Structures are given as structure tokens and as C-alpha cells.
UniProtKB/Swiss-Prot annotation:
Catalyzed chemical reaction(s): Hydrolysis of DNA containing ring-opened 7-methylguanine residues, releasing 2,6-diamino-4-hydroxy-5-(N-methyl)formamidopyrimidine; 2'-deoxyribonucleotide-(2'-deoxyribose 5'-phosphate)-2'-deoxyribonucleotide-DNA = a 3'-end 2'-deoxyribonucleotide-(2,3-dehydro-2,3-deoxyribose 5'-phosphate)-DNA + a 5'-end 5'-phospho-2'-deoxyribonucleoside-DNA + H(+)
Cofactor note: Binds 1 zinc ion per subunit.
Listed name of the protein: Formamidopyrimidine-DNA glycosylase
Keywords, alphabetical: DNA damage, DNA repair, DNA-binding, Glycosidase, Hydrolase, Lyase, Metal-binding, Multifunctional enzyme, Zinc, Zinc-finger
Zinc finger feature spans (FPG-type): 259-293
Subunit structure: Monomer.
Naturally occurring in which organism (per UniProt): Prochlorococcus marinus (strain MIT 9215)
UniProt-listed SUPFAM superfamilies: Glucocorticoid receptor-like (DNA-binding domain) (SSF57716), N-terminal domain of MutM-like DNA repair proteins (SSF81624), S13-like H2TH domain (SSF46946)
Amino acid sequence: MPELPEVETVRRGLEQKLNNFIIKKVEVCRDSTVAFPNKKEDFIGGLNNSLLYKWNRRGKYLIAELKKLGNENGRFPLEKFSKNNGFLIVHLRMTGYFKFINNSAQPCKHTRIRVFDNKNNELRYIDVRSFGQMWWIKEGLSPNKIIKGLGSLGPEPFSKDFDEIYLKKVISKRTKSIKAILLDQTIVAGIGNIYADESLYSAGISPFREARTIKKNELIKLKESIVTVLKNSIGSGGTTFSDFRDLEGENGNFGLQTNVYRRTGKECRKCGNLIERKKISGRSTHWCPKCQK
């Protein structure tokens, strides 16, 4: 599943590529991709003649601010001659990704949503396993109330609210493993299997440790490791092990730099011990038994 760095890579690509992209036509190729409104016709009607004004990210959610253009559309700056039109929100889930296509051509087999501008450029959403979802939340409605997962997210790893004091507070009585805690989106937003493993390795903490046993100095190191690992991955365009692509169809390169993730049986880059793998809460976990205590 795309995690924070992959979603942030997509967000940056969308923001750069879709400058002044005005939606003139929407085609829903798979109804189940539209999570809200209940009728796809309302989803299509809500997006038509909207400016994709600004792209944000919250955890693993992409959030586009929309502007509805009036009679003066075509005048610049467009946002001055328009009114707010709510949000287009996307969760890529397991295999979803966007592709920008100049002079739109026939859709591929797994195309789920097609969005066109008046120049026949297309923003195409492709999803092999079809778990990804989109919401059009009209102006006046609360995205956090409509999308349960969005409203329950914990702080962003880069925010000032995510520090060792916060971590100590949320784990002080937790008997769960620290790996399970990091995967809990209500505790910290955006971290998944790859970056939990890599951050714990960088911090020298065993993924099997009970969260409540981790000391303050270890929490400081863990927080710093999380931020560093995520920033490094964003700088590399995220990680591609299966379906993730950026807007240009390119793979992320961080997978070439991982220290433990998917390196089972290979030598630890620090100590030479072999990397091991075991499941925690149904998720494959990779670690170095010598470097992580």
C-alpha cells in the first residue's frame, strides 16, 4: 500500500502538473470507486466545471480543494473568479495510482476514473485491485465526519504535535508491540509497514518490544528516525515494490535503499548479521536481531 512518502510524491506531482486544470468531463469506469456521494451522477456533476485549485495530503489521503467557475471562467487568476466547491478526496489503498495523459487515448483495462480538461488532457486513475476510493465532499459538509478514517487520524509525523512527549503519553500503558503502535493510524498518520520497519531499525529498537517499555531517550531517537526515513523516501520519490507509480509513470527509488524491509536473509548493513522476518499482527516484519533491542 502507498504510504506517506508515496502519497506525498503523488501530491507534489499533481500540484505541479495540474496547474489551472479545469474539469470539463468526468467518466466513472467502475462505480464502486466512488464512495461519496451515493450516486455517481452527483459525483460527476459536482466535479464538472471545477478548478483543481490546491492539493493537500493528510496521512495517506489526497485532498484537492475545488473552485467552481462561474461566467467569468477563463479570467486569471482563476481562483479570484470562482467560489469554493468542496473537496475531491482520494485514497489509493493497495494498488491505485494516477497517470497524466496529454491528448487522451483509450483507457487501459484497470482504469477506474477519467477526468478531462477542455484540451483533452486526462487525469486517469488506475487501480488493479480496485480497493481505492474517491469522495466529492461538497462545500459545507465536513470531510472528517463523512470519511471515518480521515477524522480519526493521529498527528502527522512532521508536525510539532508529534514529539517524544506525545509518544510517551500514548504508549505509556500499551502492551502492544511498538511496531503495531506505529501502524495504528489513530496514533500517527501515514506510516505503514515499510517505514515502520525502517524507522525502528534506524532507531535500534526491536519491533517486538512492548510499547510501554520504551524509554524517553529511545522515543527521541525513534521520532527523529521516523522523520529522517520519511524525508529520505520522499526525496527518492517513494518506494515501488509492486504497483506504485508517480504521475509520470515512474517507479519510486527508495526501495533500493532499504536496510531491512524485504532484505530477509541478507547481511545487515551495520553488523553483518542476517536480517530476519516474522509476522506481527498479520504483517511481515523485518529486523536485525543484533542491532535492534
